[in-house]
C-alpha cells in the first residue's frame, strides 16, 4: 500500500511535541500535589492577545470600521425554506450596537447593572452583548430551553430589569408576574394576542427591537468604557444539581481566554468562518465568538433546529467546527449508516480506505489517493473547507477521534475547560498524532493535580501523576454571584480553582481527563464506580445512542437505561428479525430481541475496555424517547442531568433491581 501513502512532516516542532508543558520554575513542592505546569511555549501567562486589548469592549471595537462580513443568518424565503446566508458587516453591527446601547441608557441603566438575553444564537444576541459592553453593563444569558422555574430564579437572582429576547420567549416571561423585569425588548414582531396582554400590564413595558434601535439613535449616549477587572458577564451554569450558579467573569477573564485561544492550535484568521450553534449562554461558545470578533472572521448562525444543522453547515461551509462528543458520535453513526446501505463494492472500498488511512496517520503519513477516491465525499458533508474539528465538554473516545480524522481529512483535537475558566483551559495540538488527551495548558493559565485518596489517584503515581485538576490564571473566574460559601469551596484563597475532574499528566506534558470526582458512587461490596466513564464505554455499542448507568451502596451490581440508535437497529433487525415491526420505536424498545442484542454488545464493549465484573450492566431498561434538554434530562452542553435521570427512572430502577435479584438470588 506504499503507493497510496506518502510520508509527510506532521510533527511540527518535534521538541515541543515531546514535552508540551513544564513545571513552573521556583514553584513550591507541596505534599499530595504535583508542581504547577505551564505551556512550554509560554512560561509567562498571557492576559492579552496583543498587549493592547484588555476588555471585551476592546475586542468588539477592533474592527468597528470594517466592511467585512461579520454576522450571518440564512434568509427565510417566501415558501418557508431557508436560502443563502445574509450578512451584516462589522461597521453595521457597531452602529446597531451603539443604538441599542444608547436605548438601554435611556431606560436608566448604569454601569454594572444586569441585562438579560433570552434567545437562541442569532445576530441580535451578539448585538445585544456588544451594546452592553459599550456601557459597562453586565449581560446575563438565559438558556433557550430552561424551564420556567430556572428562568425565574436566574432573573430574580441576578436582578435583571431589562430583557432582550426572541419573540417566542415573550409569553414565557409574561407568565412570570413576580420577576424583576420592567422592560422587554423583542427581537421579532409579535402576534396581536401577545400585544394585547401588554395593554393590561402596567408593570412591564414592551419594545420591538426596531423601535428600540430608533430610540437609541435619537438619544445617543457616550460610552462608559469598562476596566479589565470590571465584571463582564454572568454565566449561569447548566449544572446537573440544584439551582444554577452565577459564574462571575471579568473582562480580564474573557480577553485572556481570547489570548489563550489565539496562541493555541484553535487560533483563527480573518478568512475563517465559524458555525455558531452551541449555546451562546455557554462560556465556550462565547469565547469562540469573541475570538472570531478579535481576528475579524465571519460568524454564521444555524437556523435554530439541530436536525437541520448539517444542512446549514453545507450552505455556510465553515472552516472549522466545534462540538461535543455526542455531536461527533451522531455524525459517525449517520456516516456508517450510509456506508452500510451502499453497494458491497463501495462498502469494501470504504473499509479498506479507512483501515489504510488510520494506519498511515498513526505513522505520520497521508493517503492522497484514498482521500480522492473515498474521503473527498465524506469531507463534503461538512462543506469541504473544515481545517480542524475541536471537541469539548466531555472526553472524546480515541477511536472516534481517529475515525473523524480519517473521514473528514483534518485534525481532530480535544479541549478541556469549564464555565469557571471561560470554557477553555487546555487544547491539543493538531501536530500531535496521539489521541486520548486534551493537550497542554493554554497560555492564560497553569494547572496542577492533587491527590484523591478515596479514588486511589495520587500525584506520586508512576509513570504518570494522577489527581483532581486545579486551574489558576487570568482566565479563572472571580467567584459565584451572591454565593460566597460555594466560592470558597471551589475557588481557594491562593487562586486555585478545584474542578472536580480527575486528570493524568502524560509523559509528554499533555493532560488526559480520566474520571469525575463528583460522579462516583460506592457499591455495597465497597467498590467505587465512575459512571461517566462506563457510559462512554457502553455508548460505543452500535445499538446505543445514550446510556445512563446507575448504582448505589445498597446493591452490588449496576443497572442502566439505554436509548437505542434506532437507525442502526432498524437496518440490522429488518433482515435478522423480519417478524418485528421495526418502524414502531416504542414497540421495538420492548422487544426481547433488542434487549438481548444490546446486553450482548455491552458485554463486548466491556471486554474490549477490560472492565471489571462489577462495572458491567446486569440489567437494562430500553427507552424509546431520547434524553434531551426539552425533557430536562440533558444540560445545554449535552451532559446528563443525573439527579433528574434518577428521579425520572427511579421506579424503573427499583424494578430492574428487583427482577435481577429474583432471577439471581445469589447476588
Swiss-Prot record:
- Return the Gene3D superfamilies for the record: N-terminal domain of ligase-like
Q: Output the Gene Ontology terms for molecular function.
A: ATP binding; long-chain fatty acid-CoA ligase activity
Protein's UniProt keywords contain Acetylation? no
Look up the record and report any one GO term of the cellular component aspect.
cytoplasmic side of endosome membrane
Protein name per the record: Fatty acyl-CoA synthetase A
Write down the PROSITE patterns for this protein, in alphabetical order: AMP_BINDING (PS00455)
Q: Does the keyword Iron-sulfur apply?
A: no
The family database entries (InterPro entries) matched by this protein are listed as: AMP-binding_CS (IPR020845), AMP-dep_synth/lig_dom (IPR000873), ANL_N_sf (IPR042099), LC-FACS_euk (IPR045311)
Q: Where in the cell is it found?
A: Endosome membrane
Function, as annotated, reads:
Long chain fatty acid acyl-CoA synthetases catalyze the formation of a thiester bond between a free fatty acid and coenzyme A during fatty acid metabolic process. May mediate fatty acid retrieval from the lumen of endosomes into the cytoplasm.
What EC designation does it have? Answer: 6.2.1.3
Q: Which UniProt keywords apply?
A: ATP-binding, Endosome, Fatty acid metabolism, Ligase, Lipid metabolism, Membrane, Nucleotide-binding
Disulfides per UniProt = none
The membrane topology of this protein is: Peripheral membrane protein
Catalysed reaction equations from the record: a long-chain fatty acid + ATP + CoA = a long-chain fatty acyl-CoA + AMP + diphosphate
Q: Which family does it belong to?
A: Belongs to the ATP-dependent AMP-binding enzyme family.
Q: Single Gene Ontology BP term?
A: fatty acid metabolic process
| Pfam families assigned | AMP-binding
